[in-house]
């Protein structure tokens, strides 16, 4: 098995099985496009376990993903896909960049979920782009754009209901998708507190990476508490 790719939070390896990859979650945490970064023991284990639980939950709701199975505390097997160079962001409540960009007050609840596309390009700092930009960049056609939005909203609905049952609010999240060899679009990458904003209903306590971004406590304790809440659903 050879290393195919190493990113900020994960390593991806080939396997002996055609079309199957091994993902290893690293004990690294970054914020601000890597401007802030640390090695934190145990972080990879938590993100792997959280992502595995969430992807299994989404599977029960008919959401197709690249996830196959968790194989160890820090590893999982996934289907090989060609990642679509978009971060698809779904917002239920205003927080983060949209409060600065459009002036919404933090905590403002949107009447309907908002879906945004960001172009995955480090040199350009992952800019917000429109549907027309997506087509001009030959990232996806009209049919695929519609499918990405539909899947994103289906994922949002399933996650909102899941978190609501444990007294949490899904503020926003970002996801990635990939294409299989036959052109099917699957949910890919991860869904974890690294990629979501999650607030406790009664206190607005964060269960996400904002704890690290804003130096407001232990990311390990925060993620472990969130994992414990998810495991209680099983």
Swiss-Prot record:
Annotated metabolic or biological route of this protein: Purine metabolism; IMP biosynthesis via de novo pathway; 5-amino-1-(5-phospho-D-ribosyl)imidazole-4-carboxamide from 5-amino-1-(5-phospho-D-ribosyl)imidazole-4-carboxylate: step 1/2
Catalysis: reaction(s): 5-amino-1-(5-phospho-D-ribosyl)imidazole-4-carboxylate + L-aspartate + ATP = (2S)-2-[5-amino-1-(5-phospho-beta-D-ribosyl)imidazole-4-carboxamido]succinate + ADP + phosphate + 2 H(+)
Gene3D superfamilies from the UniProt entry: ATP-grasp fold, B domain, Phosphorylase Kinase, domain 1
GO-annotated biological processes: 'de novo' IMP biosynthetic process; cobalamin biosynthetic process
Gene Ontology MF: a single term: phosphoribosylaminoimidazolesuccinocarboxamide synthase activity
Record keywords, A-Z: ATP-binding, Ligase, Nucleotide-binding, Purine biosynthesis
EC annotation from Swiss-Prot or TrEMBL: 6.3.2.6
InterPro entries per record: SAICAR_synt/ADE2_N (IPR028923), SAICAR_synt_PurC (IPR033934), SAICAR_synth (IPR001636), SAICAR_synthetase (IPR050089), SAICAR_synthetase_CS (IPR018236)
Top EC class, one word: ligase
UniProt family annotation: Belongs to the SAICAR synthetase family.
NCBIfam families: purC
Family annotation (PANTHER family): MULTIFUNCTIONAL PROTEIN ADE2, SI:DKEY-6E2.2
Protein name: Phosphoribosylaminoimidazole-succinocarboxamide synthase
